[in-house]
Amino acid sequence: PPAVREKMKLASEAAILCPSSVGQYSVSTYLDNFDWRLQIEEFRGMYRGRRDAMVSALGEFMPTCTWNVPAGGFYVWVGLPDGLDAKDMLPRAVTNLVAYVSGTAFYAGGSAGHDHVRLSFCYPEPVEIREGVRRLSEVVAHDLELINLFGPFRARPTEGVSAPAPDQI
C-alpha cells in the first residue's frame, strides 16, 4: 500500500545517507588497484553513444519538440509543444510502455515545468532508446491531435474534493 511504501522509502533513504565504513573501504581499495580512469573513459564513450542515439531519435520522431544536448550526465530535457502537459500525459506514455519524469517534479509547486520531460539514456541500449522515443512520439502526436480537434484542456477547480488519508489507503 502507498502508506507502507512511503515509510519504506524514507527508511531506505535514511539508511544510505552515509555509506558504511566497509563500503568506503571497498571503494578505496578499488581506486587503489584498478584503472578507474580507463573505466571512466569507457563509460563516457558508452554514454555518448546513448546520448547521440536519443538526440538522433528525437530529431527523427519528435521534430515539434525542443531538447538540450547534454555535455555530461545522462538526461535530456525535452520541451513539449504548446498545450501539452507532461504530468497529464504520463499515464498514456506508461500505457505505451515508455516512462519519463515530468518537469513538474523539479519545481517547488504550481505548474512550472509542466511543458518539459526528463528522459534518461543511462541504462537502455541505443536500439531501446530509439524505440522508447518512437513510442513517446506516438503519445505526443496523439495528444497534439486531440488539442487540434478540441482545443487546449483546462482543468476544472477541484473544490470540495475529499480523499482518504494516505495511511487509510
Give each language-model segment a name.
Residues 84-89, 127-131:
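Short, conserved charged micro-motifs
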Residues 99:
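Residue-level detector of anion-binding/catalytic polar loops
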Residues 1-45:
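Conserved core segment of the aminotransferase class I/II
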